[in-house]
Amino acid sequence: MSHLTTFLVFFLLAFVTYTYASGVFEVHNNCPYTVWAAATPVGGGRRLERGQSWWFWAPPGTKMARIWGRTNCNFDGAGRGWCQTGDCGGVLECKGWGKPPNTLAEYALNQFSNLDFWDISVIDGFNIPMSFGPTKPGPGKCHGIQCTANINGECPGSLRVPGGCNNPCTTFGGQQYCCTQGPCGPTELSRWFKQRCPDAYSYPQDDPTSTFTCTSWTTDYKVMFCPYGSAHNETTNFPLEMPTSTHEVAK
């Protein structure tokens, strides 16, 4: 076999392996209103009308990644504008994280033990109901999860903001809520979120019940906004306009 042929075979195998190893993410809007989906560090952003999907690929090793939805946005032809919830610096294609409140899907691909780590988090608050999980469930904690409770409608008065339910750290600050220095535990407010979304992260060290894993290399994922087709599984009155009154997966 010539050196050229050997190189071409090696290149083809490397390309196929890399392509196969890349995680495919589908982000689907099932809400009865427009959602401006966002994803970093891979993806950027996309406007999704009801029933539309957006696909992107995240390479192995992608970490500290987030997917979320933005509401009540207005962008010009150059992709500059503003969103009421989840805004990421006034651009359509996000380069950084969104401004709370926003319901988060978080993931890190191909980490230790050849596992993907992923979760739903309400540490940054809540704006849109969400489900997240592998397209083909596997053993153990490789199955779909959701956060679809009527959090906006039941939000405590101290956390209510237009279009969402804010998080205690942004609202009050301090170690008790932000958990930035050493160990910390749940608070009354984080328990309030946890009761409504038991699979979701409710405070930064909520790992035991909120981190999910799937085998790397072969797993694709789907994020769905409003999996029940409305605000949650009981009402269609969403998004709610309310009077005005960060955890990281495997690094």
Swiss-Prot record:
Glycosylation sites: N233
Keywords associated with the record: Disulfide bond, Glycoprotein, Pathogenesis-related protein, Plant defense, Signal
Cysteine disulfide links: C31-C226, C73-C83, C88-C94, C142-C214, C147-C197, C155-C165, C169-C178, C179-C184
PROSITE patterns hit by this protein: THAUMATIN_1, THAUMATIN_2
UniProt keyword Disulfide bond present: yes
InterPro entries according to UniProt: Osmotin/thaumatin-like_sf, Thaumatin, Thaumatin_CS
SMART domains: THN
GO BP: any one term: defense response
Regions that span the bilayer: none
Presence of keyword rRNA processing: no
Induction of its expression: By tobacco mosaic virus infection and wounding.
SUPFAM superfamilies named in the record: Osmotin, thaumatin-like protein
Residues of the signal peptide: 1-21
Family membership: Belongs to the thaumatin family.
UniProt name for this protein: Osmotin-like protein
Organism from which the protein derives: Nicotiana tabacum (Common tobacco)
